[in-house]
């Protein structure tokens, strides 16, 4: 039996802010370093490392790796997998926001604030994101320039297939985003209610660990969204 430790990236920049979301915040770096320390103290050694293509994925891995190396538990070179990228729900929101705002007062307020040169509140943007993506995963809306939800689910399944080729008795460290973590769990458990997959992704904490095991052709779930390394409650975040 082998194990895959799926890690959601550390806390990124504020959702909906004018700063680059694809960038770890200082708390995100701290979360990642604490995870590296916990892995070292737990005696967990990765035989293979896979990382998503975003800066926040690589920055999370780098922060973990630095701590592990300082404790004599260096990681092997990482393999970047495009299949571990997050879905582009954020891009979808901005593509469809003007059109959808014509029938949604809450969305109209976000558009109006943007037109005035103001930054909408992160809470308003997050609420809009959730409403729009729920419709997206049900196939009610979409955009030609945005990867369909079904294609996102399929590529995460391909990532699982790639990881499963490692063979028995191996441990893989996988650094990605909340969406792929949730999609991987849903694939393993056979969840086909796509809104529930979204709910799983929204519940994922930054720098959390989800542990999957695999033997032959069968995957199993051991733990989901664990944060044993984050003892300070201020570091329990979901951005």
Show the residue positions of the predicted features:
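Extreme N-terminal starter segment of soluble prokaryotic enzymes
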Residues: 1-5
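Loop-to-helix element that buttresses phosphate recognition and phosphoryl-transfer chemistry
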Residues: 10-66, 148-153
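Short active-site segment of divalent metal-dependent hydrolases/proteases
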Residues: 12, 180-181
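Phosphate-coordination/substrate-recognition cap region in phosphate-metabolizing enzymes
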Residues: 37-126
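Short, well-ordered beta-to-alpha junction loops that form the rim of enzyme active sites
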Residues: 53-54, 83, 172-180, 224
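Acidic, low-complexity terminal tails and accessory targeting/binding regions
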Residues: 87-120, 145-146, 150, 165-171, ...
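Alpha-helix-centered segments that form part of catalytic cores
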Residues: 115-158
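GST-like fold's C-terminal all-alpha helical module
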Residues: 152-154, 159-166, 172-178
């Amino acid at each position: 039996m082998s194990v895959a430790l799926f890690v959601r990236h550390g806390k990124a920049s504020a959702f909906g802010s004018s700063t680059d979301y694809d960038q770890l915040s200082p708390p995100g770096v701290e979360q990642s370093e604490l995870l590296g320390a916990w892995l070292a103290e737990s005696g967990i050694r990765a035989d293979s490392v896979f990382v998503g293509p975003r800066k926040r994925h690589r920055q999370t891995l780098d922060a973990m790796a630095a701590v592990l190396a300082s404790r004599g538990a260096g990681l092997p070179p990482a393999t970047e997998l495009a299949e571990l990228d997050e879905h582009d729900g954020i891009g979808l929101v901005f593509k469809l926001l003007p059109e959808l705002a014509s029938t949604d007062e809450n969305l109209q307020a976000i558009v109006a604030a943007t037109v005035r040169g103001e930054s909408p509140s992160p809470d308003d943007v997050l609420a809009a994101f959730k409403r729009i993506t729920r419709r997206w995963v049900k196939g009610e809306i979409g955009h030609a320039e945005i990867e369909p939800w079904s294609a996102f689910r399929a590529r995460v399944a391909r990532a699982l297939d790639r990881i499963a080729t490692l063979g028995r008795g191996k441990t893989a460290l996988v650094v990605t985003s909340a969406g792929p973590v949730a999609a991987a769990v849903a694939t393993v458990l056979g969840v086909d209610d796509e809104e529930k997959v979204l709910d799983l992704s929204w519940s994922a904490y930054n720098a959390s660990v989800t542990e999957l095991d695999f033997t032959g052709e069968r995957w199993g779930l051991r733990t989901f969204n664990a944060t044993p390394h984050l003892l300070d409650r201020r570091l329990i975040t979901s951005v």
